């Protein structure tokens, strides 16, 4: 079985210090990075990967003022970038979705999770537990009343949608390997690799455990060597220029 359609859906932008993309750089320059959600149309039903930024980020570039990342992260989010409004544009309500896949629970990937009170949210156990107590996680991203489906390690969501455990950027990050009807195999690294340079040249970037992150990149390289998928990175400005976005699909 394969995924009928894989949509790339823009979900706002985020100004991030360039030292977060390349740890060797001196902090002080901000990059304007894309924030993505991904919609998978499968035989079993629609699956959403990540939910963008929280409502508290709408028109609020100073969201992180007074925190340890003040001046290093500036969300650029409008009302249109709220996940419920994104879903309306693609023809769905929150309860229409089969699953939410949370690649990890950082603010720009799980900020909209609270809109899904019934839909199962698939997350790694190590990520869920880290988000309960580590300071880099916002409370909007680890709400207690949601329908979490806690997994451990690699996991097949439905035929053609495989989660790959890629910790390092965060304690329980997961990437996706997808078999699509139109384009063949696709690897979504998400934040296991922000950019092509992080992946191909193993340029270190921001994260929980740099050595573990490098191990995950090496693991994904083995997947690429064997399966030869199309690769999409988590926040690559250059790759963004050639991405086909909704309503186009791959």
Curated annotation (Swiss-Prot):
It catalyses: an N-acyl-L-homoserine lactone + H2O = an N-acyl-L-homoserine + H(+). The gene is aiiA. Changing residue 104 to A: Abolishes activity. Its cofactor is Zn(2+). SUPFAM superfamilies: Metallo-hydrolase/oxidoreductase. Monomer. This is N-acyl homoserine lactonase AiiA. It comes from Bacillus thuringiensis subsp. kurstaki. Zn(2+) 1 binds at residues 104, 106, 169, 191. It comes from the Bacteria.
